[in-house]
């Protein structure tokens, strides 16, 4: 190195370039050295911003200010103590560096750039600098390291705090304090190391790789986050495979060991942050052998793959070939037998990431409901303009071999017709049926027509049915028709609540499956049935999935649709009954036609109108008469208003929030006699109640009133509809998904605000009454640090633990983005610790090191437009309830009058209803979702055995697992383990 004059302890310097690439490279260089960005000014973006432009040069296009902060005494949380309060007054020298990008560099030609002074900075860890720059760094002595930055500036790093010092200075000279806080802080840090040593000493760490492959889908990031953090929690090393199978082939930097903080904020990101790519090389054995070598070199013998059927098939093939691939690697001399001995078997676990929802054996795949939500949102927008011009719109959606998106979108958007691959339309005849359906709906008063076409739609001769083919048919009808191809907008955006929840739970279960894996275990695929996470053999699921395409190619369309799950088939039949077959083809005999009442009870909830619409359309297509009881039971008592609903009344209700027929919290017991009178007057044969706990209570009151009021001897059922999800006996209520989506958007926004201001915490209050479901679910899918629910009372110990967890998070904070923190509190979690009081306690304990704010979304949680999932579920439940009423009436007809155990009622010759039995428990029921089952549960049994009447909820806390998983992923359990390790060490 040339001998240069040295400028020691420079507090401020400015360097200039007119090369943008060099500008960025220099910033990265100083970031690597530990400098932090404190200002990033862009003349074109921030020129009018007086705060950002303050202190910048007039000729700067961009300026980035980097600071190396002084070392000084820190408190228990690792935050700097103000100098006037510190017991140790020593401080190291800080430095501010201004890097400027200008139009043209102002360098005098006579200036000799070889006479540059060397700038010297103080560092307590010279070896680390050499490690970071092994080729550039030159160690001149034990206390001096020389470097050149990308602009050619000479820099030395000295271990001497001052030029006059004779011995190196350690960081303890600045950080060391005599306070108890500092001792605790260091002990906490040591506890982390102790915990890692303890976990590592018992057995060799399991190393797991996680990758995303094939087409991206919303929710993949949530799955990766769950795998990474769950793996770390269970003492594993977790690696992310970047760029899918291509990353497996390349190895090296594409296999990155992940830390806890690496996946912070990933829940709210769309796509996949670790990338995805299709690899032709991996399809060859040579490519798979190369991938095996890369995994073994990192010690990895478990792989979690999130992708479609092709990706999962490749993964399972990789597993079966693994032993022979390892033998080939040994034969090639890349590894010895001893080196590969621990890696004789490869564990594979599959997660289905696909917006098509085309995997057999699972109800939904990661990303499917997010894509459906995008479709419904777009079609809702299209409907608005279509009605204005009285147009027809043909909308093409994805689904090459699976019509799930098209079917669900058809139900959720009130489409007139759908085309799906599983049910091919008759060649040359489908045009006539399409035109007949659209013309019939127009004649009933509809102003627009919506047709949903899956991209893989075809006729029974395997000819493609395109959006333009459909358009041509509608033009023949004389309709002004437009085509909209949604394309990749369906993949875009962040994941909805359902997909975040699904990906998180499946990611956690994937790690558990890896740890439980044996060489004899078939590769598992993590799926879901109704509300329950399940495992199923990967090979069989993929085989069934591919057999659908085979059946279609063989023109066996009955087999193709039979291979879909029962829910798919049920919903397809429901769509036909409510839309296509409203031509009188399904009318029942006059003697079997019923009068069915529909009433909304309780607070407004999304999808009340969607359920009423589906029930009405199904009734009309079968000849029943649907009657809307206006304004709840109080409206019936006060005015007796009951309206017979027509097709045009409900045609546009599929995407309307609130209640079009009115709702309130009045219950049936306010005047059972008057209610019985109007039931008798309208000759009701059945009743559907939509509502929450008030609806649940009303159903019980009507059932109990059968002794005094024989008219109540009719089949009655409740469709749970409440954002609180507090109806006993069921795990799902209409409106919950809409509520959770609203909360996801709300919390994403406030977390962004918290991240922008860096050290900021929000305490968010959510609804739910005495049920902690919404709070627990929201905490899980938003990455909340803590969740306060009524089921687990808040106490000072739990608050203290949360404060410690927050301090630990912020102690390691380096000013990165995505570091806003969220705490979720149920509105009834405590009568003492209110949302504001919690915020005040945490704020006081933070001693100004981070800010705390409250956020209360209130009735925003009820949502506006119902979510696509709520719309589809509403339709499914409504049709099931009509069938329930039909079946009970059939049962009555088939029963002899002498059998008093079965509900019976008939009209006499004067048209009066004659009850023949006091009550029948099973005929008054609640439609319930429990795990993987949908069933009708008698209200009498639910009220007696499963209802906490005082707290207005069920006894079962079916969401308890969400809190446990939330504690794992937030780091709470990790912190507890560290504290326990520290306590054990102190003993």
Curated annotation (Swiss-Prot):
Originating species: Saccharomyces cerevisiae (strain ATCC 204508 / S288c) (Baker's yeast)
Protein family (similarity comment): Belongs to the phosphofructokinase type A (PFKA) family. ATP-dependent PFK group I subfamily. Eukaryotic two domain clade 'E' sub-subfamily.
Annotated residues for binding of beta-D-fructose 6-phosphate 1: 354-356, 398-400, 455, 488-491
InterPro entries to which the protein is assigned, alphabetical: 6-Pfructokinase_euk, ATP_PFK, Pfk_N, Phosphofructokinase_CS, Phosphofructokinase_dom, PKF_sf
Residue numbers spanned by region Interdomain linker: 581-594
Residues at which beta-D-fructose 6-phosphate 2 binds: 391, 482
Cofactor(s) of this protein: Mg(2+)
Activity regulation as described: Allosterically activated by ADP, AMP, or fructose 2,6-bisphosphate, and allosterically inhibited by ATP or citrate.
Residues binding beta-D-fructose 2,6-bisphosphate 2, per UniProt: 760, 853
Impact upon substituting residue 356 to S: Reduces maximal activity of the holoenzyme by 50%. Completely abolishes catalytic activity
CC terms in the record's Gene Ontology section: 6-phosphofructokinase complex; cytoplasm; mitochondrial outer membrane; mitochondrion
Name this protein carries in UniProt: ATP-dependent 6-phosphofructokinase subunit alpha
Binding site for Mg(2+): 309
Catalytic machinery residues: 356 (proton acceptor)
Annotated region (C-terminal regulatory PFK domain 2), positions in chain: 595-987
Domain of life: Eukaryota
Crosslinked positions (Glycyl lysine isopeptide (Lys-Gly) (interchain with G-Cter in ubiquitin)): 89, 625
Annotated localization: Cytoplasm; Mitochondrion outer membrane
């Amino acid at each position: 190195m040339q001998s240069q004059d040295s400028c020691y302890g420079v507090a401020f310097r400015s360097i200039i370039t007119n090369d943008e690439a060099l500008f960025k490279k220099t910033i990265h260089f100083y970031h690597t050295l530990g400098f932090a960005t404190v200002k990033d000014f862009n003349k074109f973006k921030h020129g009018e911003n007086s705060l950002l432009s303050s202190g910048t040069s007039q000729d700067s296009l961009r300026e980035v200010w980097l600071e190396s902060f002084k070392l000084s005494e820190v408190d228990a949380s690792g935050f700097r103590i103000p100098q006037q309060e510190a017991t140790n007054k020593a401080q190291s020298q800080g430095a501010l560096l201004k890097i400027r990008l200008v139009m043209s560099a102002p360098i005098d030609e006579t200036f000799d750039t070889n006479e540059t002074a060397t700038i010297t900075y103080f560092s307590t860890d010279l070896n680390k600098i050499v490690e970071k720059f092994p080729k550039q760094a030159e160690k001149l002595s034990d206390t001096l390291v020389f470097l050149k930055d990308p602009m050619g500036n000479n820099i030395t790093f000295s271990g001497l705090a001052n030029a006059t010092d004779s011995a190196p200075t350690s960081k303890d000279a600045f950080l060391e304090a005599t306070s108890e806080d500092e001792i605790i802080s260091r002990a906490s840090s040591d506890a982390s190391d102790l915990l890692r040593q303890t976990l590592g000493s018992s057995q060799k760490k399991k190393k797991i790789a996680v990758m995303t492959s094939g087409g991206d889908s919303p929710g993949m990031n949530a799955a990766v986050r769950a795998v990474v953090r769950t793996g770390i929690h269970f003492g594993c090393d977790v690696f992310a495979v970047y760029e899918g199978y291509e990353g497996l082939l390349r190895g090296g930097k594409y296999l990155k060991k992940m830390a806890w903080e690496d996946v912070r904020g990933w829940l709210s990101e769309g796509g996949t942050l670790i990338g995805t790519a299709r690899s032709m090389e991996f399809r060859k054995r040579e490519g798979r052998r190369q991938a095996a070598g890369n995994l073994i070199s990192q010690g990895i013998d478990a792989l979690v793959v999130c992708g479609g059927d092709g990706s999962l098939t490749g993964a399972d093939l990789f597993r079966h070939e693994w032993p022979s691939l390892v033998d080939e690697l040994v034969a090639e001399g890349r590894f010895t037998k001893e080196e590969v001995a621990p890696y004789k078997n490869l564990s594979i676990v599959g997660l289905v990431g696909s917006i098509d929802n085309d995997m057999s054996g699972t109800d939904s795949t990661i990303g499917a409901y997010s894509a459906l939500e995008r479709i419904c949102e777009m079609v809702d927008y299209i409907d608005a303009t279509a009605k204005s011009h009285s147009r027809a719109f043909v909308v093409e959606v994805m689904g090459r071999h699976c019509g799930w998106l098209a079917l669900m979108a058809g139900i959720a958007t009130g489409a007139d017709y759908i085309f799906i691959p599983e049910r091919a339309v008759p060649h040359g005849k489908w045009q006539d049926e399409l035109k007949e359906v659209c013309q019939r709906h127009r004649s009933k008063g509809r102003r627009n027509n919506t047709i949903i076409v899956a991209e893989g739609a075809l006729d029974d001769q395997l000819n493609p049915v395109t959006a333009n083919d459909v358009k041509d048919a509608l033009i023949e009808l004389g309709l002004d028709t437009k085509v909209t191809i949604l394309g990749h907008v369906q993949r875009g955006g962040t994941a909805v609540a359902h997909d975040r929840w699904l990906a998180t739970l499946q990611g956690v279960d994937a790690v558990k499956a890896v740890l439980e894996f044996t060489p004899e275990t078939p590769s598992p695929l993590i799926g879901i049935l109704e509300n329950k996470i399940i495992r199923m053999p990967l090979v069989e699921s993929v085989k069934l999935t591919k057999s659908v395409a085979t059946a279609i190619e063989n023109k066996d369309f009955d087999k193709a649709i039979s291979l879909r799950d029962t829910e798919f088939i049920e919903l397809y039949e429901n769509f036909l009954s409510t839309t296509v077959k409203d031509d009188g083809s399904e009318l029942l005999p006059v003697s079997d036609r019923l009068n069915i009442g529909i009433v909304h009870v309780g607070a407004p909830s999304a999808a009340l109108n969607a359920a009423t619409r589906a029930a009405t359309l199904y009734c009309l297509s079968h000849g029943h008469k649907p009657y809307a009881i206006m304004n709840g039971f109080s409206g019936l008592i006060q005015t007796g208003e009951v309206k017979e609903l027509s097709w045009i009344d409900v045609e546009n209700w599929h995407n309307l929030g609130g209640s079009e027929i009115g709702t309130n919290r009045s219950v049936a017991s306010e005047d059972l006699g008057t209610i019985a009178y109007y039931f008798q007057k309208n000759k009701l044969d059945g009743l559907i109640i939509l509502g929450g706990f008030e609806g649940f209570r009303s159903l019980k009151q009507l059932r109990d009133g059968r002794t005094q009021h024989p008219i109540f001897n009719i089949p009655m059922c409740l469709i749970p509809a409440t954002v609180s999800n507090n109806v006993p006996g069921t795990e799902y209520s209409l409106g919950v998904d809409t509520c959770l989506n609203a909360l996801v958007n709300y919390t994403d926004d406030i977390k962004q605000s918290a991240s922008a201001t860096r050290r900021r915490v929000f305490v968010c209050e959510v609804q739910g009454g005495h049920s902690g479901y919404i709070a627990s679910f929201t905490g899980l899918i938003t990455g909340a640090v803590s969740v306060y629910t009524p089921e687990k009372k808040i106490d000072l110990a739990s608050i203290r633990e949360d404060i410690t967890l927050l301090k630990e998070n912020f102690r390691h904070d380096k000013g990165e983005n995505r570091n806003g923190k969220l705490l979720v509190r149920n509105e009834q979690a405590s009568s003492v610790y209110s949302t504001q009081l919690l915020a005040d306690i945490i704020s006081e304990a933070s001693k100004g090191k981070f800010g705390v704010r409250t956020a209360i979304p209130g009735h925003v949680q009820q949502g506006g437009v119902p979510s696509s999932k709520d719309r589809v579920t509403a339709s499914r439940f409504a049709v099931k309830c009509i069938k329930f009423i039909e079946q009970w009436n059939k049962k009555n007809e088939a029963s002899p009058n002498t059998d008093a155990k079965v509900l019976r009622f008939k009209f006499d010759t004067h048209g009066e209803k004659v009850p023949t039995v006091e009550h029948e428990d099973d005929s008054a029921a609640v439609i319930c979702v429990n795990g993987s089952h949908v069933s009708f549960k008698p209200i009498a049994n639910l009220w007696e055995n499963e209802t906490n009447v005082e707290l207005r909820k069920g006894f079962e806390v079916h969401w308890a697992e969400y809190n446990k998983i939330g504690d794992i992923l937030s780091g709470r359990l990790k912190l507890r383990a560290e504290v326990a390790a520290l306590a054990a060490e102190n003993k």
